[in-house]
């Protein structure tokens, strides 16, 4: 458990090996997204108070811990990631605050094929999503 009331659960808690250069624990919050505007993946696609809380809690872990937001971009046709400001403006504000505070955002790109899921690297991060609402999934 972590967070202000120690009532939240993190998706992954990575504990560095004793020989690691950075001894801080790494808290990882995973988000899945399928909503896009062209080659831009967006999260969230609706208001998410839970997602807002996660961003606040990740920010509060700094600097004693590393905090990572790990968006899984479940579309093979995306190259970039941004907050879904048009769906949840508050999440967008908290996203930018968290990024400025040092929360790491690592959007993972994949290619889905019959033989499996293939890693395509990290998407670039944009700090603002489109002003108009693209069609939600």
Short names for language-model regions:
Residues 15, 33-36, 46-48, 97, ...:
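Residue-identity detector for threonine
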